[in-house]
């Protein structure tokens, strides 16, 4: 069964968790098993979110970093926190081999650009 694991950076500001909840709820319309975890500061941690997916029966997991670009968190921290060693994309869980596929960061997308334009316009219109 496919599991989707959203990865958020995290923040000392508790409202960050609301973003994870909203994205997980949205993706739950399309996928049965969706969890989110934070790289730092907030709960659930990435490891806790992974454990939740495994406990629910996920045997293939697509990890979706909600990050704009490739950096240290993407290249080093996410694989380490998931227990992935080197180029190996599998982990062991209760005697089973679990495949983990890490999606690319968001990068540039015109749809995200449209959201940014909307945000600029709304902010400007509220203030002028």
Swiss-Prot record:
Pathway: Cofactor biosynthesis; adenosylcobalamin biosynthesis; cob(II)yrinate a,c-diamide from sirohydrochlorin (anaerobic route): step 1/10. Its EC number is 4.99.1.3. Gene3D superfamilies: 3.40.50.1400. One of its GO terms (molecular function) is sirohydrochlorin cobaltochelatase activity. Keywords: Cobalamin biosynthesis, Cobalt, Lyase, Metal-binding. Co(2+) binds at residues 9, 73. It holds the Pfam family CbiX. It catalyses: Co-sirohydrochlorin + 2 H(+) = sirohydrochlorin + Co(2+). Substrate binds at residues 43, 68-73. Homotetramer; dimer of dimers. This is Sirohydrochlorin cobaltochelatase. The gene is cbiX.
